[in-house]
């Protein structure tokens, strides 16, 4: 049976995990109910110049970590979800900086950002996007599936449900974005179920409810595409997939590309 390679202990350290969070959440208090305008621009709405500057920061601080789990250094072909996620789960479980639930949650969150988001900051071209879709996304979604399948009980806390961020969507959302990026409908259904549970929990808090609604609307855009085509047509070109006539017509008619060119 194939097994994943271990993470490079010289790279994957508490210092790395802290630097990921410092970079991604700069200026945003732990547990915040709403993102700051600065954070929103950093993640979603920044200008072309601002995105380029942030990409440069990501490359400077995190490229060694991303490269250390590249296809050649961390091959995943033939591995199950559990096997792919195993090295990351093991690293979270040891939690060198204390080992409590909050420490584990923070490391898990750092991994979700590193695996799902940072490759998108480093690899934006047609030539490099296949690395995102074909390698880093499968790793990210494998870890996300593991996390949401963890048992919830009095003796343990599922990392995405840690009380400090349970009602903090600016933090908690990153555990689930890999499900949104997935082309498997089951992942989208899992995300929608989580959002429904969160809506029920927070319906009395208008600040949180509004943010949940925004995420839900964005997920609905994604899931409708996967329901219709079984995949994201805007990825066809860079992945060398032959588009269907329906996909071509849809894309030419303004179908969603989520900011991806080529």
Model regions: which residues?
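Intrinsically disordered, low-complexity activation-like regions
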Residues: 1-262
């Amino acid at each position: 049976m194939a097994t994943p390679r271990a993470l490079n202990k010289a790279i994957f350290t508490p210092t790395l995990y802290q630097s990921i969070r410092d970079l991604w959440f700069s200026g945003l208090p732990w547990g915040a109910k709403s993102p700051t305008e600065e954070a929103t621009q950093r993640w979603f709405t920044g200008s072309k110049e601002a995105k380029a500057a942030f990409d440069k920061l990501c490359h400077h601080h995190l490229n060694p970590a991303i490269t250390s789990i590249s296809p050649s250094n961390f091959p995943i072909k033939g591995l199950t979800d559990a096997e792919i996620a195993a090295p990351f789960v093991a690293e979270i479980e040891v939690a060198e900086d204390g080992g409590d639930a909050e420490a584990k949650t923070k490391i898990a969150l750092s991994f979700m950002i590193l695996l799902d988001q940072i490759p998108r900051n480093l690899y934006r071209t047609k030539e490099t996007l296949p690395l995102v879709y074909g390698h880093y996304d499968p790793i990210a979604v494998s870890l996300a599936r593991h996390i949401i399948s963890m048992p919830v009980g009095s003796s343990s806390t599922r990392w995405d449900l840690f009380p400090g961020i349970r009602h903090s969507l600016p933090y908690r959302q990153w555990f689930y974005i890999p499900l949104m990026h997935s082309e498997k409908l089951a992942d989208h259904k899992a995300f929608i179920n989580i959002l429904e549970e969160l809506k029920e929990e927070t319906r009395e808090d208008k600040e949180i409810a509004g943010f949940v609604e925004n995420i839900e609307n964005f997920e609905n855009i994604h899931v409708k595409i996967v329901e219709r085509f079984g995949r994201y047509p805007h990825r066809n070109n860079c992945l060398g997939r032959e588009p269907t006539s329906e996909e071509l017509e849809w894309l030419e008619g303004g179908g969603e590309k989520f900011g991806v060119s080529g």
